[in-house]
Amino acid sequence: LLVAALASAAALLGPGGLAAQPAAGAAKTGINQNFIEPGEATKRQEEHNNYFLSKAAAEPAHILDLQTSPYALAERPAGLDYDTYSAIAYGLATSMMVVGPSTGVDGARRIIIIDTLEDASAARKAGADYLALYNRKYGAALTKLPIDAIIYTHNHIDHTGGVLGYLDMADKDACPIEDPSVAGADGAYVGRRNCVEIICQEGVTDAVVNTSTVSGQIIQARSIYMYGIKLDSGIGAASPPGSNIGKAITNGIGPFLSKGLSGYRMPSRTFTDQLDLSAAGVNMQVIYVPSETNDELAVFVPDAENGAAASVGKSGLLFSAEVVQGPAFPNLYSLRGTQYRSPETWYQSVDKLRNLDSWCMVPSHGPPVCQRKNIQLLLTNFHDAIQFTHDQTLRYMNMGYTPDELVEKVKVPDVVVEDLKTLVPWPNAPGNDSFQGPVHTEDYLIPFYGSVPQGVRETYFGYVGWYNADPVTLSPVPPTQAAERMIALVDSHKSVLEGARSALAGKSREDFQWAAELATILVRAHPDDMTARKIKADAFRKLGARAIDPNWSDWYFTAAKELDNPPGTCFINYLPAGLVSPVIQSRIPIADWVASWTWHLDGQKAAQEKAGMALGFWFEPTEQDFGSEGYILQLRHGIVEITDWQGTKADWLTHVDVALQMSQKVLDGLIIANSFFPGSVPPIESGKVTLLKGTKEDVKHFVGYFDGNPACEPALAVPRH
């Protein structure tokens, strides 16, 4: 009976990846292998940081100079009139500086910043080091950075979140925000000289809105697990090697995620497919390359248009963004949660880069890859790994295989990794000794960020959605009830507990996975069972110690820490920062902030009480959205309908029960101070917010239907009960 019950439990819970990866064994890693021996897994993560960290133990961050490196100079044509630098290990991403030939009235050469890191503090640190380098290299004594343009390669916070730090250090203000009526225009564009241009693809702001308001709260919580923010840091050399088990060692595409305050600045110029941009005297092709995000861009700097002889043909320098996602298998799906990433679109964008004659490729994560042979090898194998994952998933999907079955079938050929052993990356190149050690070249397709199983499941979901075609999944027994029935099936809680304990005492990864799955049944039925919680936590620690992918190991170890606490513990206090930073929320369009009220509504409560009030917001004057703006929030049938009012203020007032007016400057200040958010009453008594209609009690009654900010981030490792 017990054997039958446990088999039923396995069928109910799914294999959880049991057969998706080979059992732990030799230290050899491969594109399909996510687990190795515990000490070896930690050691490989430590060695992987050699892609990022400098050899100076006290200062892991450093700036790479493409003008002095023999590796970068090998195929660089003579006569180029711009210089390029790459700031590494200031955070998760890389921030690049291009020094152009154009000068200001002070004679200083103007610059372009590509990607801004994740927060203002990281950007200021990189900016200060760039300023010191600039003064040293160009014989200047500047106190501000001579920035003409900032380019976001895409919307993610580690590429946009530090923009306010750079703008604080710039010698002029940002250009006015682009008029939405003319957004997305392609063609030639010469950057203005009297302000800092903010350049990006037209979809960036919409994506920032999504992660800062729509899905930001849950993605923020999941990011804490994925990046190991609750774990002790294992950055730097360990003694002995491999002794950092349980710590956050690397983030795979960067050494760590900076924890400062993130911000945003809406762009001054966007494009759709290609922008021929001239800024700081540098002529660039800004190319749309949807891949890791649907708003990704790459920057190609043609040699012949930037000082080199015309005889060089169509060669140039490439800023590849995250089309090649650093030294790791691409994150075709991110564990923190993302909208669908099409693998087909991604490898097609890789092809766009393959078709460029690049002598050096500067990515937004990790060091540059220079010399045509290296670039083409990496791009080709990166393309092939993604296409194989995509095509073979479709092949088996069309045979009727489900996601759990697909991860057992789709195995990318090892040859795409083995080929990379001939690649020469920057840290291994002769004459480049700024990194803390040599690297494994095959890491560019080893699961240090994404993984094949993640990509397989995402591909299935993108084409046919969540339903696996077995009707048993249409209306399953609720999880808690299913767990209780499973325990009853084997006659006792104790039987399942002993099964979990026995599996935990095993030696294979499959044993530890099974222990975690059995313990999950117990914890789901009885969340206060600390013995079961401990077994599940210990199983996660054993799995985390063997996971080569830091996203996986950090999640295992963080989940174990959560399980160590009794039920009801606030494991992670809610903090309005990161993706949901109030600074970011204050910089998005007003309409999007108002729209965020809709998913904070307690629909059941509003429907039961037949709530039908209408609240009006009037913002006057506005700064970033061109004119006064009025909105109506109408409660009805457990939803709140938002109307963007197009009529007069007087007519608007007749359509609402309660009306509030404030300037955009006041709204932004209240958001930044965390004094006004969905579910809260604005400080009417301050005099900055005017109550045009209704009473303060009416306002309280209306906002009482909405959730305020939570006290804690949602628990993720403990099943809902």
Predicted regions and their residues:
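Active-site metal-binding motif and surrounding structural segment of the metallo-beta-lactamase
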Residues: 65-66, 101-109, 120-197
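Signal peptide processing junction and immediate N-terminal pro/mature segment
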Residues: 12-25
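Bacterial N-terminal signal peptides
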Residues: 2-14
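Conserved beta-strand hairpin/beta-sheet module of binuclear metal-dependent hydrolase folds
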Residues: 67-142, 298-300, 305-322
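Feature captures hydrophobic
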Residues: 499-502, 508-517, 521-524, 528, ...
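Accessory terminal helices/loops
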Residues: 22-60, 207, 211-257, 354-360, ...
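Metallo-beta-lactamase
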Residues: 65, 79, 109-121, 182-186, 190-195, 259, 263-265, 274-278, ...
